Amino acid sequence: MIPKLSPNADPCTACASTPAFPPQPMEEEGEFLYQLRLEYSREVLYARFHAALRVHTFVVVPTRYGNDIARCVGRIRTPVQTDIASVVRVASDQDLCTWHIHREKERAAEMIFRDRIEHYQLEMKCICCHYPLEEARVVFLYSAPARVDFRELVRDLGATFGTRVELRQINEREEARIVGGIDCCGRALCCCSVFSRLRPVSVKMVKEKNLLFRSTQMMGRCGRLRCCLTFEE
C-alpha cells in the first residue's frame, strides 16, 4: 500500500518511515494447518489448530502411540495429500516436565535393551527408545537385516520395565533420518533436514539426469540411492 504524503512532507523520509513488510499478528482467528515433527523419530505430521503457533512451539498431538509431544515446523498454506490430525493443546509446563523425565528414562532403557540383545545373541540393532507422553508403554525402534524372533526378549523386557513393551522394525532410510549425520557434500543428511517425508528414489532418476551410475557415489549413508536425486523431479 502506498503511503499518503502531506503537501510539506519529504517523500524520502515518509517512505523510509513506513515499513515495507508490517509485522504479522501473533494470534489469528480460525483454524490453521501446521507441519509438526515428532522429536524421537523425526517423522512429520500435519495437524490443525485454532490459533497461531510460533515455529518450535511444542504441542500435544495424537499419534499411533497415543498423545505425544511434537514440535511446530511451520504453517502450511497449501493442501496436503495425507491424513490430518488435530492438535490437542499447546504443551504445558507439566507436559514438558514429563517429556524431559521420559527422555532420561529412555537413555537408561536403551542401554538395557542393547545389553539384552547381546545376551540373547540377536542380529538386530537398537536405534532409539521412546516413552509416549500419556501411554503406559515403552517403544523400541530397531533395525535388522532379516526378521527376528524376539518373543523371549519382549518377555524379559516386560518383566524388567514392568510395563507394556513394543518393538518396531524400521528400514535403513528411517534409521538414517533418526541418527542423522553429515554427507559427503558437507551438509546434513537430506532425510533429516530437507525432506518432510522420505520420497522413493529409483535408478530411473539417475539415468534421466545423465549421471554415471557409480554405486559408491550414488549411495547415501543409509546404503540406498541418495535423496538429493529427487530434487529436480
Curated annotation (Swiss-Prot):
One cellular component (GO) term of this entry: cytoplasm
Alphabetical list of Pfam families matching this protein: PSP1
Superkingdom: Bacteria
Domain PSP1 C-terminal span(s) in chain numbering: 85-170
Stated role: Supposed to have signal peptidase II-like activity.
Identification of the protein by name: Protein tpl
